[in-house]
Swiss-Prot record:
This is 3-dehydroquinate dehydratase. The lineage of its organism: Bacteria, Pseudomonadati, Pseudomonadota, Alphaproteobacteria, Caulobacterales. The keyword Metal-binding does not apply. PROSITE patterns: DEHYDROQUINASE_II. InterPro entries: DHquinase_II, DHquinase_II_CS, DHquinase_II_sf. The record marks 19 as: Transition state stabilizer. Keywords: Amino-acid biosynthesis, Aromatic amino acid biosynthesis, Lyase. It comes from Caulobacter sp. (strain K31). Substrate binds at residues 75, 81, 88, 102-103, 112. One of its GO terms (biological process) is quinate catabolic process. Homododecamer. Gene3D superfamilies: Dehydroquinase, class II (3.40.50.9100). Pfam families: DHquinase_II.
Length: 147
């Protein structure tokens, strides 16, 4: 049996649908979770979907993915711009890592244009709202050779 794709979402993403919907869209995190699970199922895969506002929890889950996941999709949110510890954890993985953002960081404030996570990512999907997660699932599925 193929291991699941782990999908991690960072700080403030629990507020999707209500926090700056003009930037992040109206979909809630539960909506995103359902869309990810449905997209993975079409490819014969499952998803472990988690969110935390705490850097240490995200790092623990990245480390868990080393043995429990076939690929990792991560929306690091603000930690992407600040967390070398998260980068170091991601560098320990030997599975595809897809960085995912709802908005396009390159089209936003200067401080959002650099992400440490990109240094460890296989690829990046950004700017498509909640569909960014689905596109990241699709990319991960392709990289692991799913149906």
């Amino acid at each position: 049996m193929v291991k699941p794709i782990h999908v991690l979402s960072g700080p403030n993403l629990n507020l999707l649908g209500t926090r700056e919907p003009e930037i992040y869209g109206k979909d809630t995190l539960d909506d995103v979770r359902a869309r990810c699970k449905a997209r993975a199922a079409v490819r014969g895969l499952s998803v472990v979907f988690r969110q935390s506002n705490h850097e240490g929890a995200l790092i623990d889950w990245v480390q868990e993915a080393r043995t429990e996941a076939c690929a990792l999709v991560i929306n690091p949110a603000g930690y992407g711009h600040t967390s070398i510890a998260l980068l170091d954890a991601l560098k320990t993985l030997n599975i595809p890592v897809i960085e995912c953002h709802l908005s396009n960081p390159a089209a936003r404030e200067d401080f959002r244009r650099h992400t440490y996570v990109s240094l460890a990512a296989t690829g990046i999907v950004s700017g498509f709202g909640a569909a960014s997660y689905e596109l990241a699932i699709e990319a991960a599925a392709g990289l692991v050779g799913a149906n």
